[in-house]
Regions:
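Periplasmic c-type cytochrome electron-transfer domains
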Residues: 1-212
Length: 212
């Protein structure tokens, strides 16, 4: 549950009173919250508000969803090939479940130095900033791939502006491939673009990521 996540001291060290106190510092937010929750900012109202918000994030009925339900014409042949390649490369190991991600923390530099060529920042520490464990350095939550075409830029440091760039980084730093097959990248992009769903029966709107 949301309450369990916030109580997890390794990721969220603050208790409810501290969280509520911080939120109350925003007087405009506190006033709006009291319109819905007269009791004000508490652990219960925070979790309820977040839960209600998260309901709006459900975006089903993507072309890929329709394909999985048996509509062979819902996605292109290239997208189908991209999906097979996605499975062959093992991408579903981390990008798993209905959300295709968001369930685990993985190392950004599994097969290479993701941070080479630039100065490191505190954000590059990843999960270690919360857990304080050296073993969690450079570990980041795997993002969901739902609506991925609309959620650019990519990576924790926004270093990839396009899907092609993001895939290229994964090829190098997660799979350890030196040479990139551009045809494979195009197939994967075709597949990823089928993951844009609907909200209230209409296609999710947003700024599409730039073309490579």
């Amino acid at each position: 549950t949301i309450a369990d996540v916030i109580r997890w001291h390794q990721q969220y060290p603050d208790d409810w009173k501290k969280i509520a106190a911080k939120l109350d510092q925003d007087t405009a937010f506190a006033a709006e919250l009291k319109k819905v929750y007269p009791q004000g900012c508490t652990g219960e109202t925070i979790t309820n508000a977040i839960a209600e918000y998260e309901k709006t994030l459900i975006t089903p009925n993507s072309p890929f969803d329709r394909y999985l339900k048996g509509d062979e014409n819902a996605i292109s042949e290239n997208a189908k090939k991209g999906y097979k390649l996605f499975l062959k490369l093992g991408c579903q190991t981390c990008h798993t479940g209905p959300a295709m991600g968001g369930q685990s923390f993985e190392y950004a530099d599994l097969k290479g130095d993701f941070f080479a060529g630039r100065a490191k920042t505190n954000d590059d520490n990843g999960l270690m900033n919360f857990s304080k464990k050296e073993s969690d350095r450079h570990r980041f939550r795997v993002p969901t791939l739902r609506n991925v075409e609309l959620t650019w830029p990519y990576m924790h440091d926004a270093s990839a502006q396009t899907l092609e760039e993001a895939i290229t980084k994964m090829y190098h730093y997660q799979l350890g491939y030196d040479k990139l097959d551009k045809k494979e990248v195009r197939l994967l992009v075709a597949f990823l673009k089928t993951l844009t769903g609907e909200y209230n029966g209409k296609p999710v709107q947003g700024e599409v990521c730039p073309a490579s």
